[in-house]
Amino acid sequence: MIKCAFYLAPDGKLLDQLSMEQIKNFLATGEGLLWVDIEDVTNEDAELLSNVFRFHPLVVADCISKNIHPPKIDDFDDYLFVIVHGINYHIESEVVETTELALFLGKNYVVTSHDVPMRSVSSMLDRVRKDERLMRRGVDFLAHDLIDTLVDNIMPTIEEMDEKNDQLEAEALHEPKRETLMSIMQLKRSILALTRVILPQREIMNGLSRGEYALISERAQIYYRNIYDHLVRIEMLTLGLRDMAESVLSTYLSSVSNRMNEVMKVLTIIATIFIPLTFIVGIYGMNFANMPELAWRYGYFTILIVMAVIGISLVVYFRRRRWL
């Protein structure tokens, strides 16, 4: 479904909400700048991409498919096909959601396609409506602004992951639970998903900033280099976040191990206290006929006192040794 269609005429006038016929006519002129945004490609949209824009069937199939494709760039001489990814991090469910944006860059048009609403695209649509100058600089700058907005939206995700990491570190240190371990492992998976998004896109931006594609002007290349620098910085932050998550996991395992050691120490002390008591009880439980203490009037109470003295003495000894 065509979500929005802009056309910046050669005279600088911006037209919005274009019909299918207007899109065909403006594209045929080869003048001005056309931006068509498609959300959740329908059969009619697929015909527009195939028959009007004449895109290759394979890239049209990529747009129709609901699968997530790896970030990439394909050069078809008269247009570029770029796939980039955005990230949404749901802090409640601790899950990273990857969103895919496909861009077609032609001589006088930009076509964007995505399956779900994207904050970066919605933000650019609002900005263009308020200031048509964003389209006056050309298709390469319009594509840059779209990708730059998408990359900028990754930073809040990293900040949220960092906050979650700090929270899990506190839990792992003071109150480690099974749920804490599950959250740590989910965070590690989210960081891995983020890394898989960033690394390929960094290489794409590197190619766009080095003059490898004729549709990217020399003036725009420096701006793509800026996106590349942002992705390098994000990559460094992500690697740092990964190391911090590993540290939190180690903290959790150490805390659980320490707690287990404390439990084992208490159980060992209890067992040690009862060893001599069990020994005494065992002797007087042998039921030999000739055991004088069994007939003694105060034998029972004497044995209880002896056992109490032994138990208390061991407790005092353990406390002095700081084992209790």
Over which residues does each language-model region extend?
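Peripheral, non-transmembrane regulatory/ligand-interaction domains of membrane transport proteins
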Residues: M1-R219, Y223-N226, H230-R233, G240, ...
